[in-house]
Amino acid sequence: MLSFKIRDKTFESRLFLGTGKFGSNQQMEEAILASGSELVTVALKRIDLETQTDAILAHLKHPRINLLPNTSGARNAKEAIFAAQLAREALETNWLKLEIHPDPKYLMPDAIETLKATEELAKLGFIILPYIHADPVLCKRLEEAGTSAVMPLGSPIGSNKGLKTIDFLEIIIEQSKVPVIIDAGIGAPSDAAKAMELGADAVLVNTAIAIAGNPKLMAEAFKEAVMAGRKAYEAKLAQKASQAVASSPLTAFLYE
């Protein structure tokens, strides 16, 4: 399985993880290590940015793990930009998962505010990974604005409904000149495998692992599914046929 790059970092694992909803920080750490993930996202609202004493950070200090702070909770571009600047100063990283969702019920990303924030954050030197609707036009606009990757949703955050936006994801993957990371709604290892078979560069998973009966084992399952899906993509999947085609034709043998 080939590695891939997002700006200045090379990743061997194509499985990125979220850190919310786990029963404990210890459980979270075990799942992350079992997954082989090299990039984990953490909400700024969960960290004491002044002292960095939040226990979650202690469980994420591993050589292979890179932190991706996110702006979850930001309702507009102004709030997201402010949060991004705080994160860069406190965590010493210019990497950012940009999340702007003003509606607390459905957590749908605000496309207009996300584009606005991306334009400003790119000027400030941030490496931006925006969480967005699976909108091919928006993805191209964000690319032009300076985003380092795009993170279109498969279905609503935490829904575990899988790839409900697959038709649009296919277009995004075909057109994108930056890495495509499918985020939100991936509820089973089979969903992750499908995303990789489509040609996505990576997937980000949280809820499906965090609330599983055995998060560590589920993390291992996702790791294997992502690897299998990516290998299938690299091997070039056989095209689907509209009618049956025998793998071992016997016509000539039968009628000799």
From Swiss-Prot:
Q: Which Pfam families match?
A: ThiG
- Which Gene Ontology molecular function entries are recorded, alphabetically? thiazole synthase activity
Q: Which residues bind 1-deoxy-D-xylulose 5-phosphate?
A: G158, A184, G185, N206, T207
The active site lies at K97
Recorded hits in InterPro entries, A to Z, give: Aldolase_TIM (IPR013785), Thiazole_synthase_ThiG (IPR033983), ThiG (IPR008867)
Question: Can you quote a single GO CC term?
Answer: cytoplasm
Would the keyword Iron be found if you checked this record's keyword annotation?
no
Leader sequence segment: none
SUPFAM superfamilies from the UniProt entry: ThiG-like
Q: Tell me, in one coarse class, where this protein mainly resides.
A: cytoplasm
Residues crossing the lipid bilayer are none
Q: In which pathway does it act?
A: Cofactor biosynthesis; thiamine diphosphate biosynthesis
Q: Biological process (GO) annotations?
A: thiamine diphosphate biosynthetic process
Kindly state which reaction or reactions the protein catalyses: [ThiS sulfur-carrier protein]-C-terminal-Gly-aminoethanethioate + 2-iminoacetate + 1-deoxy-D-xylulose 5-phosphate = [ThiS sulfur-carrier protein]-C-terminal Gly-Gly + 2-[(2R,5Z)-2-carboxy-4-methylthiazol-5(2H)-ylidene]ethyl phosphate + 2 H2O + H(+)
Q: Where in the cell is it found?
A: Cytoplasm
State what this protein does.
Catalyzes the rearrangement of 1-deoxy-D-xylulose 5-phosphate (DXP) to produce the thiazole phosphate moiety of thiamine. Sulfur is provided by the thiocarboxylate moiety of the carrier protein ThiS. In vitro, sulfur can be provided by H(2)S.
**Assembly information from the UniProt record:** Homotetramer. Forms heterodimers with either ThiH or ThiS.
Q: Which family does it belong to?
A: Belongs to the ThiG family.
The molecule here is called Thiazole synthase
